Amino acid sequence: MSTTTKIIQTTDIPKIKGGLPFLGHMIPFAKNPFIFMKKVSDQAGEVAQFKIFNQRMILLTGNDASKLFYRSSDEQLDQSAAYKLMTPIFGKGIVFDAPIQKKNEQLKMLMPALRMNAMRQHSGKIITEVEDMISDWGDSGEINLVEAMKQLTINTATHCLLGKEFRYELTNEFSDIYRDLEKGVNAIAYSFPNLPIPSFRKRDKARVRLHELVHKIIEKREASNDKHTDMFQMLIDTRYKDGTQLSSNDIAGMLVAAIFAGHHTSSGTSAWVLLELLKNPFHMKEVTQELDSLLGSDGNVTFQNLRETPKLENTLKEVLRLHPPLIVLMRQVAEDLLFKNHQIKKGDMVWASPPVTHRMAHLFRNPEVFDPDRYTPGREEDKNLMAYQPFGGGKHKCSGNAFAMFQIKSIYSILLRKYTFEFVDTPDTYVDDYGEMIVQPKSPCRIRYKRRTADTFISKYGTAGDQQEASSQCPAAPSTKAQPATTTTEATTNPTFYISIDKQLCQGHAMCAGESPELFNVSNNVATATVASPSVSMLEKAQCAANHCPNAAIKITTDHSSK
């Protein structure tokens, strides 16, 4: 009996012309990474190859190619090998420098501070930081918006995530340390992270100093009887699965990783929210009216009532589509892959580019137009998770995405009710600065502000925030106890629905368990449905949980076959 082997004919991946000996396409990439990759995608399509130094790069853009990038396993596409530039920042053996299992274990340690219950506690801290920032603004004036947002978001991130020592005792020094670390992420670092250049020397000195500070704080806390509930203390108390305690170097690296997750995606985005609203007065009016109606002139801002701001949220989503903070995401190919008869070889570096995919007309209608309504019911252009990817995708999606969204919404729930704003310079001068790998608007980014008066409010509820906290919650379930799985008899008289959870997307934010503890449980950073087929009376609660999942990992269906 003979057997036959099917031979798959492969075709070459389209090559980008040009490039210099040894350097390849490094010069145009370093000059403007976004423009370079947009041209690559426009010329070659969803998969293209080029070289940076002697490394073959494969750019994957669009829906299908992005699915390969975000859905492949770690055994196929190695995230850690692609991010060696982060080792001098996080430290040896931390996150991307750790074996896969240890890296995943470390990232799970950070999740409790980014979950729903923690964020309920964060709201007051964020509001305090915003009010501190504007306390000396007076009735009118001018600011550099980019610098103001950089300082505000580092203050909120340290206050919420690191603890009082970093926020109140080391404020200026930690800000300087963080900025030196952040400047170590640039185009050169992707290929040569250890070159003896000034920015890398500053980065390395900052990392050493951070370790020293962390070690001193640990010693101080161990000698004190004070009780701490912040992420810092959580890491001090946490153990690896084998019982090993985290070293001070481990903790320093983990804290920086947490700040990168909760800050670097939000400072530039925070600035762009205001800039885009100023460029689009109609949407500015809608967002301001929404906040006025919900909170009045002095209503309290809470985690719950900020969920009732769809216009602000859709504005933020659209800002993230047009101005995603990361230009490129990377993986190293660990085993040969086939994509539409194109062979991607072991050792290749594959890239995804959110800003390029976000501007594809077949994925987003009129992609260059600022249009927050594209996320409203009936359009929902963010539902395709392989197209809308400001925080990445798959199981490696940025775990700080929910915190970043909440942080920015909190900031503008205060600023837009306190002041009106206007450009100092002509609107077309406010553009992205692609000279950095973490995108910000170009500086100086000058904005003029003026305090609002009571007669400018659309509605005045006073302390409406307190009233809204209760009324804006998802509808209560008929019972606070978990329901048993529906029996066949019940299904006949009481229709059911089905819950499925994409384990690759779920990161354990626990929004679902917070909204519907009757239906969901989170253990070991993975959510599970506690009821196999709930009665339809629980459908509204389940849909609420699905709507608030930051990773869109929950699917509600009425057809068991599609579960």
Task: Give, region by region, the residue ranges found by the protein language model.
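Conserved cytochrome P450 catalytic core segment spanning the I/J/K helices
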Residues: 21, 28, 115-117, 154-155, ...
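Cytochrome P450 heme-binding "Cys pocket" and the immediately downstream C-terminal segment
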Residues: 281-283, 403-438
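Iron-sulfur cluster-binding cysteine motifs and their immediate structural context
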Residues: 511-524, 546-560
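Cytochrome P450 heme-thiolate "Cys pocket" and heme-binding signature region
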Residues: 256, 303, 342, 355, ...
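Conserved cytochrome P450 K-helix/beta-meander segment immediately N-terminal to the heme-binding cysteine loop
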Residues: 352-380, 458-466, 474
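Conserved cytochrome P450 K-helix E-x-x-R motif and the immediately C-terminal K′/meander segment
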Residues: 25-45, 212, 216, 300-340, ...
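Cytochrome P450 catalytic-domain helical core, especially the substrate-recognition surface
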Residues: 13-38, 42, 56, 83-162, ...
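Central I-helix of cytochrome P450 enzymes
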Residues: 153, 157, 210-217, 238-293, ...
